[in-house]
């Protein structure tokens, strides 16, 4: 049926012919390839390729069916073959025992070298770890060979080998060995797990392996959370990147370089940016062609190493990416569709594999040198170096003495004698290690050299390791070490070894002496068991009377009473109460003191020990305190302890009874201001104790307090009299006139009152208390030593209340307290004051109180011998109750010898105490009988196997002490190798015990360059974090100049730039220089080791290029350099974990991070300094300035981390829904921002259809591009254009007309047939429906296809010079 109706077209998938190159951009029809027959083993990889091929050539449905058939096939044959896994399938290779045996031999040889002091502790550790690592790898090979040759159909082997499940590292643990494990600090334990899971682990191995297992689990848990958050940030930064244009028409591109002549998948699906020509200038691939695998192969065949391709990084589409710059959509391997949300796809592609990345890495604890480039001899013969060879001595990390080549040369192995073999040539590069000498005869299969490829400057860091002593004895240095004193900035002096050499410890029994002991034997004296080696004495400081106490624990206490004081005229009386014992002191005149501290307790200086019980200062009720003028008190820090009286006088007391209550007012049984007698009931159940006037305080009908003030009330209306007195009250002296008819003979307290009867004066009586200047002290008797401390008692009077204080109380209070406190002078801290109860000398029934100052001396018990102190014997030199003088010896402790031997004292500076001595015993020496003349002399140091005479060899390490004609005496010792620059903790001749630190080895290990690996590294890159201790980067290109300072440490580094400007760089300590003198460097190159700060890198690139190019080009070029390095860094992390991600995804994210610049100087534009703005916008503004002749804006490119970039997007709705909601929304409100709803997120939040996929409308973009050169303004013009509403493509909508527009444009007119089917599908009657989508626009509305925009809007644009008048 031929139809004349308009065809329905879709704007999204349109076949646009490119006039120049004529390439259709839609999917080509699926190719039908002829069947081909392949006969080979299909493993996981082959399956992958098969499914992928099927998908590309035959489409989804066929591929799904094929995959299903493959699955059935797999199950069928697995069932037929009865494949299963049982314990018997885990076959341990027979070679395992030999391999482990070899490793153990190597390691015991290494341990022996270490024992003989031939290698350092670090070298031993490194060698052990490397040996096990190598063994493990060889074992994996053995496992593979064993399965391949003996049991190729083993189910475990098939499973791991085909890629169905598991990998070699797991199979290795099942049937090889579990291998080395790391401890919780991440250092490798040098004890590997030699067994596998088939043989079973020992308990120790199980515990060691559990470290790693726990680490793995914790890691996984943390990883999922981190990875999820990374994905969220990525989605946020890239969600508005949608393919919105066909071709942005850019001329910029990026260069992809081949690795080893291969491009791999890096070119697939990209469009060429220019014609690709081969070496003969023939066109292979025209510009703008999508590269498929065939074309990629063609490029490689033509040996082209660099290809320029289009990339999202250089796409000039506004706020989006165009189809040609993006290339293929990897879902179907055809050019990406318009409206594809490539930003979200990129974010998910980078975020999803995050869980597969590891979080942290292990340190190896030493340089793990993998045996790289090892050359072994193939024939036996003589080694010959070529004439230009230059070598120097070198010590490998394993402590092997080797040679290092200084230049490139050729080494030959020439066969000797009638050997017909060809000679073997080895090309030696500079820096390689040689294990043979020139002219040396070697056999075949010997390690000849380790070739180092290229002069790679590795970044190294300093690490340290302690050397701990294994036996007690005396330290001796080898002369080679040449220790030198180094003073650091703080003035601390350390000893450092200058050369590689040995530190010896010669055996002996070392005794630790107590602090005050001194040796009583001289050096070189022979001693036997029980000889006294040293003596320590303990003496009294002040002297006094000795008291011996019972022993406590392993020591005995001797107390010396230096000062005592007894209270003679007081009896000590003990009372028992239910709360415990109470002690009182009673004098003959009846004065009573209450004791605060029980006898037997210790007290300190200034402490109150007793209070005077004195009823004279006790009142009957509460009241008001007034001090008379003579009475004065010391200022107290706090009134808690009262106020100490400094001068006696009279204390005045005005009694007043206060009942504090909380009851209803209805219970009140008296009236306010009424006179009552003592014993009256004022409130139910509360009686007054005194007569006087009642004052009632109430609040909200609740009684608070009732006061009864004693005295007499006199009515008075005389204003003059009343004004003399206040309501608070005044004191009136005796004889002073108050009112007519009142004769006052004592002090009165007068208050003005208003009562219900009228006004008047209340005259209150005043009680007087006399306070003496000094409190009475009890009678004391002293016993004191000449030099000893003084002890005394002091009586203190304290007033409880301050002047004018009102005490609210019903019961009486104590106004004055007298305390007895202790005073002592010249007492040392170890002295204590004891309170004791003593019987009276004359009357045993009376107890007296005694205060004594004791000097306490702890005397050691006798001990049997222990490892470091020897046995001790202590004697007391005093008896109980005897008197001693100051400085008398109380006890002596002797240190006794444990075994027979010779004493040696260490060398000490005069007056320094000797803290250790050594006894050289018989068992520390070995006598070796000799038949020939000895070849060693006294003082020589030998190790096992060194010759002593013509035929005898040393059987132990040590120092020769005696040489006679028939024998040699050797003192056993232990050598420790120390490397240059090690810090020595001991000096020559020092005595050390087992476990003491001897030295701190300082060694260099390769900086594990990617300690920050996996996820944290990805996060560091994408968040553009500034690393700590970052590398120093070269600012502008030039030539390096390195100068050595005065001392070894200081080096100055500078770069001479092109105008002979010298730029000096500040070097921090511990930084290694990565460039050499005279080297040519460019901006952004690393000068020292350390992580690179991406912000600094961008600045260096920019400042370097800015000198040669205009601003906009410099910004573009520096940004593109940084983009490349960021993309590569991110790729490296994923590649190292075996994750493949297409470059274009990372490029989309990096594009978002580098799209902004910071305005430095606004020129004549409307921009603000410090503003972050898109580079494209600044470019447009500056172009406009160039036309009008205004000053352009100056700017510098910036790099934003993904979080920062998300918060800096144009859309405030998107930014607010991400982080810092309040801040973003407040700023948007203040600045009056509009959100144009360009991204997905904004539309989802508002609830519209998202502008991607079918909701993407290309109409606005097309109209804008037809309208003129500035798409941005048109796109943002809200009136004037009808936005294509986001509807499904098979409906259209009749929009309400915009008042400024006379008519409207309609998209995608459906045909009548389409409308009919839709109506039927929804059951709509056409006549009754006024629903916009189903009403056909009538012809009267005169729609025309070529709609003109709003004329007013056009005029506005022309005035701004953004549209031409045409």
Curated annotation (Swiss-Prot):
Keywords: DNA-directed RNA polymerase, Metal-binding, Nucleotidyltransferase, Transcription, Transferase, Zinc. Its EC number is 2.7.7.6. Residues 1354-1366 have a biased composition (Low complexity). This is DNA-directed RNA polymerase subunit beta'. The gene is rpoC2. SUPFAM superfamilies: beta and beta-prime subunits of DNA dependent RNA-polymerase. The lineage of its organism: Bacteria, Bacillati, Cyanobacteriota, Cyanophyceae, Synechococcales. Pfam families: RNA_pol_Rpb1_3, RNA_pol_Rpb1_4, RNA_pol_Rpb1_5. It is an enzyme of class 2 (transferase). Binds 1 Zn(2+) ion per subunit. GO terms for cellular component: DNA-directed RNA polymerase complex. It catalyses: RNA(n) + a ribonucleoside 5'-triphosphate = RNA(n+1) + diphosphate. It comes from the Bacteria. InterPro entries: DNA-dir_RpoC2_beta_pp, DNA-dir_RpoC_beta_prime, RNA_pol_Rpb1_3, RNA_pol_Rpb1_3_sf, RNA_pol_Rpb1_4, RNA_pol_Rpb1_5, Rpb1_funnel_sf. One of its GO terms (biological process) is DNA-templated transcription. Zn(2+) binds at residues 248, 315, 322, 325.
């Amino acid at each position: 049926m031929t139809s004349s109706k308009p065809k329905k077209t879709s704007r999204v998938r349109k076949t646009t012919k490119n006039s120049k190159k004529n390439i259709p951009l839609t999917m080509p029809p699926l190719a039908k390839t002829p069947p081909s027959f392949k006969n080979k083993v299909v493993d996981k990889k082959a399956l992958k390729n098969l499914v992928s091929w099927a998908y590309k050539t035959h489409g989804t449905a066929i591929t799904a069916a094929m995959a299903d058939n493959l699955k059935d096939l797999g199950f069928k044959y697995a069932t037929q073959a009865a494949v299963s896994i049982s314990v018997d399938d885990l076959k341990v290779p027979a070679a395992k025992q030999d391999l482990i045996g070899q490793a153990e031999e190597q390691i015991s040889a290494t341990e022996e070298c270490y024992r003989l002091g031939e290698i350092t502790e670090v070298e031993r550790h490194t060698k052990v770890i490397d040996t096990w690592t190598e063994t493990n790898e060889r074992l994996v090979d053995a496992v593979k060979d064993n399965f391949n040759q003996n049991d190729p159909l083993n189910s475990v082997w098939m499973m791991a080998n085909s890629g169905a499940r598991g990998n070699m590292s797991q199979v290795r643990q099942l049937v090889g060995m579990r291998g080395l494990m790391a401890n919780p600090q991440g250092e490798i334990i040098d004890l590997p797990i030699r067994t596998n899971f088939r043989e079973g682990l020992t308990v120790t191995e199980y515990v060691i392996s559990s470290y790693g297992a726990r680490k793995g689990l914790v890691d996984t848990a943390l990883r999922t959370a981190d990875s999820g958050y990374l994905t969220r940030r990525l989605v946020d930064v890239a969600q508005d990147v949608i393919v919105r244009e066909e071709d942005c028409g850019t001329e910029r591109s990026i260069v992809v370089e081949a690795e080893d002549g291969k491009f791999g998948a890096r070119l697939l699906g990209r469009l060429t940016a220019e014609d690709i020509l081969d070496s003969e200038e023939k066109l292979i691939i025209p510009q703008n062609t999508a590269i498929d695998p065939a074309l990629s192969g063609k490029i490689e065949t033509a040996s082209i190493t660099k290809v320029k391709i289009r990339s999202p990084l250089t796409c000039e589409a506004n706020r989006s990416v165009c189809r040609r710059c993006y290339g293929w959509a990897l879902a179907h391997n055809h050019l990406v569709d318009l409206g594809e949300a490539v930003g979200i796809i990129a974010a998910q592609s980078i975020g999803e594999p995050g869980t597969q990345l590891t979080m942290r890495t292990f340190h190896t604890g030493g340089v793990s040198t993998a045996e790289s480039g090892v050359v072994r001899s193939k024939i036996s013969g003589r080694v010959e170096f070529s004439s230009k060879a230059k070598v120097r001595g070198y010590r490998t990390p394993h402590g092997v003495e080797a040679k290092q080549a200084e230049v490139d040369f050729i080494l030959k192995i020439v066969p000797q004698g009638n050997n017909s073999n060809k000679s073997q040539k080895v090309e030696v590069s500079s820096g390689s290690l040689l294990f043979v000498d020139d002219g040396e005869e070697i056999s075949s299969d010997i390690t000849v050299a380790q070739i180092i490829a290229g002069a790679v400057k590795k970044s190294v860091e300093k690490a340290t390791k302690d050397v701990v002593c294994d036996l007690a004895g005396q330290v001796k240095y080898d002369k080679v070490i040449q220790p030198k004193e180094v003073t650091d900035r703080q003035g601390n002096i350390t000893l450092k070894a200058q050369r590689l050499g040995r530190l010896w410890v010669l055996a002996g029994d070392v005794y630790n002496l107590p602090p005050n002991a001194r040796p009583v034997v001289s050096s070189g004296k022979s001693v036997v068991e029980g000889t006294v080696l040293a003596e320590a004495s303990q003496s009294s400081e002040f002297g006094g009377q000795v008291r011996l106490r019972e022993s406590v624990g392993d020591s005995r206490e001797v107390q010396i009473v230096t000062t005592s004081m007894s209270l003679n005229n007081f009896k000590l009386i003990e009372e028992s109460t239910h709360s415990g014992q109470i002690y009182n002191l009673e004098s003959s005149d009846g004065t009573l003191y209450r004791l605060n501290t029980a006898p037997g307790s210790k007290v300190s200086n200034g402490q109150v020990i007793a209070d005077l019980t004195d009823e004279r200062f006790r009142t009957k009720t509460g009241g008001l305190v007034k001090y008379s003028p003579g009475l004065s008190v010391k200022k107290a820090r706090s009134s808690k302890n009262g106020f100490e009286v400094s001068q006696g006088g009279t204390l005045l007391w005005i009694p007043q009874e206060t009942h504090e209550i909380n009851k209803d007012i209805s219970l009140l049984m008296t009236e306010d201001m009424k006179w009552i007698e003592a014993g009256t009931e004022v409130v139910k159940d509360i009686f007054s104790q005194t007569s006087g006037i009642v004052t009632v305080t109430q609040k909200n009908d609740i009684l608070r307090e009732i006061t009864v003030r004693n005295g007499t009330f006199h009515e008075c209306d005389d204003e003059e009299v009343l004004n003399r007195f206040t309501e608070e009250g005044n004191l009136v002296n005796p004889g002073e006139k108050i009112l007519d008819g009142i004769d006052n003979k004592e002090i009165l307290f007068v208050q003005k009152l208003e009562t219900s009867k009228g006004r008047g004066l209340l005259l209150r009586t005043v009680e007087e208390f006399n306070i003496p200047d000094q409190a009475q002290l009890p009678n004391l008797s002293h016993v004191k030593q000449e030099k000893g401390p003084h002890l005394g008692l002091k009586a203190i009077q304290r007033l409880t209340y301050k002047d004018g204080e009102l005490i609210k109380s019903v019961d009486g209070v104590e106004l004055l307290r007298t305390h007895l406190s202790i005073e002592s002078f010249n007492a040392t801290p170890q002295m204590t004051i004891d309170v004791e109860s003593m019987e009276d000398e004359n009357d045993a029934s009376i107890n007296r109180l005694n205060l004594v100052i004791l000097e306490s001396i702890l005397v050691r018990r006798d001990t049997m011998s222990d490892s470091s102190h020897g046995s001790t014997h202590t004697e007391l030199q005093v008896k109980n109750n005897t008197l001693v003088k100051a400085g008398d010896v109380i006890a002596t402790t002797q240190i006794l010898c444990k075994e027979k031997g010779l004493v040696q004292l260490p060398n000490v500076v005069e007056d320094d105490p000797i803290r250790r001595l050594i006894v050289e015993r018989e068992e520390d020496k070995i006598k070796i009988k000799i038949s020939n003349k000895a070849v060693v002399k006294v003082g020589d140091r030998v190790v096992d196997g060194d010759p002593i005479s013509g035929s005898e060899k040393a059987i132990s390490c040590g120092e020769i002490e005696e040489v006679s004609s028939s024998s040699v005496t050797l003192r056993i010792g232990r050598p420790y190798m120390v490397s240059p620059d090690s810090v020595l903790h001991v000096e020559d001749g020092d005595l050390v015990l087992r476990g003491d630190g001897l030295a701190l080895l300082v060694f260099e290990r390769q900086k594990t360059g990617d300690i920050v690996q996996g996820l944290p590294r990805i996060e560091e890159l994408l968040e553009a974090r500034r690393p700590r201790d970052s590398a120093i980067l070269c600012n502008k290109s030039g030539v390096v100049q390195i100068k050595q300072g005065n001392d070894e440490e200081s080096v100055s580094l500078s770069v001479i730039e092109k105008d002979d400007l010298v730029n000096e760089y500040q070097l921090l300590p511990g930084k290694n220089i990565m460039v050499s003198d005279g080297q040519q460097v460019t901006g952004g190159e690393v000068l020292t080791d350390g992580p690179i700060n991406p912000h600094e890198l961008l600045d260096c690139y920019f400042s370097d290029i800015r000198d040669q190019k205009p601003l906009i080009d410099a910004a573009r070029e520096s940004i593109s350099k940084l983009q490349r390095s960021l993309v590569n860094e991110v790729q490296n992390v994923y590649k190292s974990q075996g994750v493949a991600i297409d470059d274009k995804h990372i490029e989309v994210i990096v594009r978002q991070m580098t799209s902004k610049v910071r305005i430095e100087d606004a020129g004549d534009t409307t921009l603000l300094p410090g503003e972050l703005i898109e580079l494209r916008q600044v470019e447009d503004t500056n172009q406009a300035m160039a036309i009008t002749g205004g000053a352009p804006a100056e700017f510098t490119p910036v790099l934003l981390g993904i979080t920062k970039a998300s918060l800096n997007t144009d859309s405030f709705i998107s930014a607010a829904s991400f982080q810092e909601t309040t801040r973003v929304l407040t700023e948007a409100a203040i600045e009056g921002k509009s959100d144009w709803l360009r991204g997905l997120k904004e539309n989802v939040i508002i609830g519209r259809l998202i502008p991607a996929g079918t909701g993407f409308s290309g109409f606005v973009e097309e109209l804008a591009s037809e309208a003129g050169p500035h798409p941005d303004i048109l796109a943002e013009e809200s009136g004037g254009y009808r936005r294509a509403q986001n509807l499904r493509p098979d409906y259209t909508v009749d929009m309400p007309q915009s008042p400024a527009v006379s008519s409207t444009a309609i998209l995608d007119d459906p045909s009548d047939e389409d409308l009919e089917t839709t109506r039927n599908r929804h059951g709509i009657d056409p006549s009754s429906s006024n629903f916009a989508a189903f009403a056909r626009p009538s012809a009267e509305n005169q729609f025309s296809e070529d709609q003109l925009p709003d004329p007013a809007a056009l005029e506005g644009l022309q005035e701004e010079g953004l549209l031409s008048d045409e």
